[in-house]
Amino acid sequence: MRYLSFRKNSQIIAAGLLLADTNSILDLSHQSCIGLLGNTQPNLLDMVKLGLEPISKRIKESLKNDPPDKDAVIELKDVTFCAPIPNPGKIIGAAYNFTDALDERSLPYPKEPVIFIRSGLTTIGPYDPILIPPDVGNVGYEAELAVVMGKRALHVEPDVVMKLIAGFTAHNDVSGSGMIKEDKGNFVRGKNMPASAPFGPYLVTPDEIRNPYAIDIQLKVDGKTLQDGSTAKMYFKIAELISFISKQMPLEPGDIIATGTPGGLAMVHSPPAWLLPGQMVQVDLPGVGFLTNPVKQGVPYFEQ
């Protein structure tokens, strides 16, 4: 199933489900759907915490037996998407985790996963602008497959990891490469610029993904292909990666793991393909999601 978060009005973000026609969604906050969600609110993070599997089962049975209430159906063209998990507790990224990206820069393969933490406050959704702060240069793109945790993970072994996953989504791990270089490889500043972590449009449940290591990853800037790779080049696979992270810190439902990016990074192009205000970036992971974001300069406004 393909879940989403969408904005109903300026105050309310609700959960939805892409319907079989792929042209409309089911508004899970509609009164006709409340009984399908169990004892939780119609937002995707709460649903993940309760457990998406039983919710999905109830929804499938309901749709099989009866068509949805027409007032609960919204045409896709009228939906304002948010990130599937708009406020994740934390985002853990994997650096240096695709062999083609390492090979093109003549970098050694790491002996263990190299990870960094992003604030959940860097999250934005489809069509939201990627914001480049004033006086910050050398900002790069990184198209990635992201994993949303469905259950707590602490000191877990690889053989149980896939049972703990709620789903997958597309991600652009926008990075201040200039700051990372200035900080001698420290990721904190370069990976935590506000409005620099697009996700979406959907949280795709694991049963929809036949093989997570056979997903094409493509990124275009203004229509020009700059990354064209595959999760087949992932060095530390999902189970091994999440197991490693769980032995460094607890992972909670709704936390997001960004699994790394293929070759074609901005610095390897000639001239370097750093992101610039006015550009349009598209991330395409067939079967997972197509993510589009404009690039602007500025800082976001946070309401108090």
Model-derived segments and their meaning:
Residues 9, 58-60, 74, 101, ...:
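Catalytic-pocket segment enriched in acidic/His residues
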Residues 86, 93, 140-142, 252, ...:
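Residue-level recognition of short, solvent-exposed, well-ordered loop/turn junctions
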Residues 1-94, 98-113:
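N-terminal non-catalytic cap/leader segment that marks the start of a structured domain
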Residues 18-19, 108-126, 141, 276-287:
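Structural signature of FAD isoalloxazine-binding scaffolds in flavoprotein oxidoreductases
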Residues 2, 90-91, 144, 256, ...:
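Residue-level marker of beta-strand positions
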Residues 96, 118-120, 134, 141-145, ...:
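Short, structured patches in soluble enzyme cores that scaffold and shape functional sites
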Residues 4, 81-83, 103-106, 130-139, ...:
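A generic local secondary-structure boundary/capping motif
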